[in-house]
Amino acid sequence: MNNSYKNYNSYNSYNNYSDVGGYKSLPFFKQAEIIYDFTVEFVKRYIDYKSRTKDQMEQAARSGKQNIPEGYLQKSLEGRIKLLGVARGSLEELLNDYLDFIRQHGYRLWEMNDPEAKKVRAFVYNNYNNYKNYNDYITSADKAANVMICLINQTNRLIDQKLRWLEEKFVQEGGFRENLFKKRMERRRVY
């Protein structure tokens, strides 16, 4: 295990990180966190440290993770939808960086039914899905990139589902400002 992640599990246990509700319990947040950590390690190993791609991949992975809690903590559905959309866009950008890496290096892209792809996709359904599940894959550039392609695709699908749900909720219930305005108008009628 890489030194930078040696204490990863003890950190999570110490802070009761995995037991916290809210956005930290969202499967796509957990996956975005793994994607970010894995990407930081990936670019250290396989992308030239002077390359602009290194910075862009790290920033896209970070944005994919960080916009989830920022959006989740918004009072308005519009804010949640917007920031979750930003997270989704960042992960799509990162997905394309990994696809470019595979193509530019002449590596084989795993097909959806490839045994390795199925194994990686199964990690997501594990209650203990965390960075160490993916640790064996970081030692090979082509496997590491393929693993992230699988995980990002899964995460994007989950975010898309959440966005559809939030959009439907917005249509049914209205937005934060709209509801505040209704409450204000009701109060005026009472007084």
Protein language model annotation of sequence segments:
Residues 1-191:
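Amphipathic alpha-helical assembly/interaction segments
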